[in-house]
């Protein structure tokens, strides 16, 4: 497998979003990492309806908590890039590396402040004035496509 950036989800809430992200990652041959606990079970019918036959266990890694996630990332010397509406740097002006892990927060909350302090960089997707945020699956697709494009992987 070609080395590519990874997508990580912090305690995802919505099964349909997580399933759509898994499909996107599967279609682009990108590893997805899920930091538990999730707000749903993997056998949830809403999850299964969207993920269909795109669930490849070799491409998904689960972490029991964020401490385990950050320990392994530090050991593997991977940069963790947090996508957040609280950042000031636009994703399009950032230089992604193929060894990056791009982290997305929970749909209902994002990530706690302690996570903001642990990441290497924080980026945002600029939005139209007075809009809060994009759907999580859309945000992953936009950011992942840019990361792959910059690294000439699509």
Task: Locate the predicted segments by residue.
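Short, hinge-like loop/turn segments at secondary-structure boundaries
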Residues: 49-55, 98-100, 142
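Structured adenosyl-cofactor binding patch, chiefly the S-adenosyl-L-methionine
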Residues: 118-154
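Hydrophobic/aromatic ligand-binding patch that stacks against planar heteroaromatic rings
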Residues: 24, 114-115
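Short glycine-rich anion-binding loops that position phosphate/pyrophosphate groups of nucleotides
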Residues: 85-89, 106-109, 129
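RNA substrate-binding interface of SAM-dependent RNA methyltransferases
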Residues: 1-85, 148-149
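Active-site oxyanion/phosphate-handling segment shared across diverse enzymes
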Residues: 91-99
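Ser/Thr/Gly-rich flexible loops in soluble cytosolic domains mediating phosphotransfer, phosphorylation
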Residues: 106-114, 133-136
